[in-house]
Amino acid sequence: EIGLRHPLRVVLGDLATSPTVRRMHLPPLSESAVRTLAAGTDFDPVELHRQTGGNPFFVTEVLAAGGQGIPLTVRDAVLARAARLPSAVRAVLDAAAVIGAYAETDLLSQVVGAEVGAVEDAVAGGMLLPKDNGYAFRHELARQTILDALSPTRRVTLHRAVLQALRAVGTGPDDLARLAHHAEEAGDREAVLAYAPAAARRASSLGARREAAAQYERALRFAEDLDPLERVVLLEGFALEAYHTDQMER
């Protein structure tokens, strides 16, 4: 078995673009078309359309794989396209994948530096799309593939950079969950214990109790050495939110 960044991945993906292969342009499938294709399966057609962007190849490959993660054929195609791009552009893709489904322009610039040209090249290369005041991957599966291909060290480093950049560009109450996520992925215990409980309280105040429970649970994963009284506060918060969302078995 070969790794996600093995050179053979490029070869496998390039086979689909060989001059000896007849290429046909297919427009994205509509949500209705995806629903028809997914009929009789356990797939949520709306979620499938969101993840694939309606890309016919992605849709059919995901359905054929039966929900067993991202199909290798999709991974090969995405990684082959990324491998052909300059290293500066690949760095942009790595950062955008870690930032999430949507990467604000100023945040992305903070993480990768003032590489405006590299961001534009990522768009020209068909990997990113301009969206509002930032960028998004053309397909969520492409973002997840790039994210999965990162080494553990690279991923942690980028999450730390994103966390630092979020603090630098300024955040508000609605960013607490995002900060908590990147703090956890960066392994920053102090930041998790600062942001996750605050994110839980914010979610609870908005009636998002399941999200609140998840944030308390996130904090508790880093609370082993916390002062007993502070840990009790987290446990009580989690218990209350779990009760309201019928998750007491957890």
Task: Label the model's feature ranges.
Residues 25-226, 237:
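Short secondary-structure boundary elements
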Residues 249-250:
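Alpha-helical repeat scaffolds
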